[in-house]
Amino acid sequence: HTEFKDSELGRIPKSWEISNIGKLTQFVTSGSRGWSQYYSSEGSLFIRIGNLTRDHINLKFADIQLVEPPSGGEGTRTKVKVGDILVSITADLGVIGVVNESLREAYVNQHVCLVRLESVSDVNPRWVGHFLSGHAGQEQFEKKNDGGAKAGLNLPTIRSIVVPLPSPQEQNKVVRVLDRLDSEISIKQTKLAKHQSLKKSLMQDLLTGKVRVTVN
C-alpha cells in the first residue's frame, strides 16, 4: 500500500474500511449459567475458556467437558457454527478462537462470547479472529474491561470493538499466511516438546548410571 489515512486504529491503508463488530454480526451472545446440570460422559462438546489459547486462533481440546444440552431456545442460541468467533469475557480477557469445519456439535459456556458474522463472504471470520488476537485488538479489550478489579467484558462492549476491513481478497491472503505460520509453529512446538521429554528421560538414565556411555 502506498496511500494511508487516519482512523480509530491509527494509520491504515486508504482502501481499507473500519467497522465495529456489532455492524458485522447476525448476533453476539454468551452461554447460559447453570449448565453443570447437563454435564455428561457422552454428548456434545462444551467450550470453556480453557479450550481457547493465545498461541493461535484454533480451539484446543486437551481437556474437554461433554454435555447433553437442553432442547429449545437455550440450546439453539449457544450452539456454535463454522466461522463463529469465540472470545473469553471473564478472567483472562480476549482469548480468541474461531470454529472450523472439523468441530463436532458444540456449545459455549457463560464465560465465552459467541460472535456470528452476517456475511462470511464479505468478512473472513479468521481475519477478524487474527486481528482480535493481535496487539490492536487486545489493546481494545484491555481498555474496555468493565469489571475493575474483577476482569470482565459484556456483550455491548464486544459489539463496540473496532476492526479494519480490507477487501475480501486481501483478507483471505493475510489469513492464509498467518494460518500457515501458526501451523508451522505448532509442528515445531510438538517436536520441541518431544525432544524435551527425551532429554529429561536420558538425563535421568545417564546421570544415575543406568545407561553407560563409552569414553574414548
Where are these regions (language model features)?
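Non-catalytic DNA-recognition/assembly elements of restriction-modification systems
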Residues: 2-31, 160, 168-169
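A short glycine-rich beta-alpha junction/loop motif
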Residues: 89, 105-113, 126, 146-169
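Amphipathic alpha-helical coiled-coil/heptad-repeat segments
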Residues: 9, 164-216
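Periplasmic-binding protein-like
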Residues: 137-141
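Sequence-specific dsDNA recognition surfaces
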Residues: 4-7, 22-37, 50-82, 102
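A short beta-sheet element
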Residues: 48-50, 65-133
